[in-house]
Amino acid sequence: MKQYLDLCRRIVSEGEWVANERTGKHCLTVINADLEYDVANNQFPLITTRKSYWKAAIAEFLGYIRGYDNAADFRALGTKTWDANANVNAAWLANPHRRGVDDMGRVYGVQGRAWRKPNGETIDQLRKIVNNLTKGIDDRGEILTFFNPGEFDLGCLRPCMHTHTFSLVGDTLHLTSYQRSCDVPLGLNFNQIQVFTFLALMAQITGKKAGKAYHKIVNAHIYEDQLELMRDVQLKREPFPLPKLEINPDIKTLEDLETWVTMDDFKVVGYQSHEPIKYPFSV
């Protein structure tokens, strides 16, 4: 929690105002933030200075793992996080590539599981990584990326947390995740959970020990309509100890994640928090 709160304080005290064309709002912004999560000791980075809803974050990333491209599929997993971008985003609604209600286009998991080659064939990036790590192979290119500029016009949103690099040292697996932009009051809670859980899951299904997850953010910001709540409410609260994440040990393969796994297979233990804070969300 300390590193999260330190980043929030840094933005409030050192940030500069930057206009955001997509949302029409101004953001208090800092460049470059590095966070680290201790997955080995199960220090689950769930925000405690406001009530945080972890299930939607894991459900969303499970949808990425499955390569989903429709908000309805994400809702079925237990998260509504793509409803607005799929159905309210004005630019996407006017995009001729949009295929109707709930369509997200070629975003996130679609790129991770079916990256298009010039000849029309696709590459399953995640499958390659899982296969290599299971065999104890780290070719120093165990990289999953959702960032495909050639297909930005085919999706409702460019990826924010866009690239994940796995590193195997002995039998310990580490993860470095890269994020181009982060709405700190709302998005970072989600992203922290996802980085931590992704490493925990990948270690489990490849038979490796989980090590540390490193989270690198380029543009970390607080929107103008979020600042007062962050400065005058959340940063005034004392954090509680971090909880732990329990994952069903029967999850042993990528196929398990693709088929039968639900949110019932995850449990957070020992979570204490302050009252919720309703931060505005910018589409």
Curated annotation (Swiss-Prot):
- Please list the residues that bind dUMP: R22, R180, S181, C182, D183, N191, H221, I222, Y223
Q: Which residues form a coiled coil?
A: none
| Subcellular localization(s) per the UniProt record | Cytoplasm
Q: Any idea of its EC number?
A: 2.1.1.45
Q: Which family does it belong to?
A: Belongs to the thymidylate synthase family. Bacterial-type ThyA subfamily.
NCBIfam families for the chain: PRK01827.1-4, thym_sym
**Which protein are we looking at?**
Thymidylate synthase
Q: Which organism is it from?
A: Haemophilus influenzae (strain 86-028NP)
